[in-house]
């Protein structure tokens, strides 16, 4: 029995790129392939709509939190695509999602972009908004020498926008914010950027302006920003924080990456039964093991804790690559056949750029030394314990 005989493999080979969301084929792929965990339907999507619907109260900017590759850009892209084109509502493969997003469908114009790191946030934001305004013949110019507050200028910009498009709102979306803020903090400029974030969030209240961005972790709790804690609290008051949870990532793995019929689940359940005595939690969590098979449930939990290597931490892409290697293999009756998080280190070792990170190089050099000693002194399945310890060491230095 091969892996591909007991599940439907739908690989995720790339994360959503904002700069391609204007391409129709790309849009349809993003709309059709979105997976809807219950938490998205119960909380995340309703919160988006609440903060976007015209005439709402206490509306704020939107901060979407999730590790690399967990679907932040896909989630924001989905909302934007429906908001800018009502026809896209019918392309959603979930009836409840269509009902939730009906109030915002086709109500907005959208400008999305990825942050460059060589300028101040206000200069970048006003440049991008100006580019949008000029392309739509909206009569407003930002003055870089203006003494008006950020909020005043945003208000004037929206007034000009609504003069031209009275029935539309305006969404400004940034793909990733955290790395930009970290670099600004390193250069001593963070405190000048936080008032801009505050103003952008505040501009969303009782207007048709929506500002959203993605981050890998809450900017308020990032330890490198705590020297600006007072200002961060003011920023926090202006944003809704929508977090993609570990359970949501597991759901995407189950329903899109490694989907299974009930008959296939029964086969997997029978395959795993002989191994339950060897896993402390398998008996009580057999359905979790079955639904995620062949991924060990602890893989996702440990994977997201590793803070090294941006591209390597794209969990859905990483699992796609790892399963692609074994999909045509026979499943041994003598082994559970699980993808465990120790295999992740092997993949990282193949990335030459990782050696530029001194922490990773230290772990790598130590592992090679231990490997050599074990190879020369022991026999049998002894290296697997070392592989297990490798990502554990990375967790301690992340």
Per-range role (PLM):
Residues 99-109, 114-119, 198-330:
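Conserved P-loop NTPase catalytic core
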Residues 109-152, 178-187:
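Conserved P-loop NTPase mechanochemical-coupling segment
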Residues 77, 123, 168, 172-175, ...:
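P-loop NTPase catalytic cores that bind/hydrolyze ATP
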Residues 386-387, 391-398:
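Single conserved hydrophobic/aromatic residue that forms the stacking wall/gate
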Residues 1-70, 82-83, 230-246, 250-260:
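Walker A/P-loop-proximal flanking segment of P-loop NTPase domains
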């Amino acid at each position: 029995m091969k892996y591909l005989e007991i599940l439907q493999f739908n690989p995720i080979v790339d994360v959503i790129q904002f700069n391609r969301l204007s391409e129709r084929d790309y849009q349809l792929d993003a709309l059709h392939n979105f997976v809807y965990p219950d938490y998205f339907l119960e909380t995340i999507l309703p919160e988006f709509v609440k903060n976007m619907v015209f005439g709402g109260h206490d509306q704020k900017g939107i901060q979407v939190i999730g590790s690399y590759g967990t679907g932040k850009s896909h989630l924001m892209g989905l909302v934007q695509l429906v908001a800018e084109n009502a026809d896209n509502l019918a392309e959603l493969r979930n009836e409840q999602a269509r009902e939730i997003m009906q109030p915002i469908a086709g109500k907005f114009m959208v400008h999305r972009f990825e942050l460059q790191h060589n300028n101040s946030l206000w200069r970048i934001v006003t440049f991008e908004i100006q580019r949008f305004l000029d392309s739509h013949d909206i009569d407003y110019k930002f003055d870089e020498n203006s003494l008006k507050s950020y909020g005043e200028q945003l208000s004037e910009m929206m007034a000009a926008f609504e003069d031209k498009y009275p029935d539309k709102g305006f969404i400004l979306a940034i793909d990733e914010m955290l790395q930009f803020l970290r670099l600004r903090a390193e250069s001593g400029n963070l405190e000048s950027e936080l008032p801009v974030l505050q103003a952008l969030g505040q501009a969303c209240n009782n207007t048709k302006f929506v500002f959203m961005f993605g981050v890998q972790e809450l900017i308020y709790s990032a330890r490198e920003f705590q020297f600006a804690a007072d200002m961060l609290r003011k920023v926090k008051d202006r944003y809704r924080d929508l977090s993609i949870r570990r359970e949501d990532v597991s759901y995407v793995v189950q329903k899109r990456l490694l989907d299974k019929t009930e008959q296939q689940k029964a086969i997997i359940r029978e395959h795993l039964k002989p191994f339950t005595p060897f896993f402390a939690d398998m008996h009580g969590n057999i359905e979790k093991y079955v639904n995620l098979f062949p991924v060990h449930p602890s893989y996702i939990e440990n994977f997201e804790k590793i803070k090294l290597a941006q591209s390597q931490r794209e969990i859905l892409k990483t699992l796609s690559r790892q399963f692609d290697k074994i999909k045509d293999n026979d499943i041994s009756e003598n082994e559970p056949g699980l993808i465990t998080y120790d295999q992740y280190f092997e993949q990282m070792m193949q990335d030459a750029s990782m050696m530029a990170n001194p922490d990773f190089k230290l772990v790598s050099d130590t592992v090679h030394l231990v490997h050599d000693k074990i190879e020369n002194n022991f026999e049998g399945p002894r290296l697997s314990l070392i592989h297990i310890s490798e990502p554990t060491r990375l967790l301690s230095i992340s």
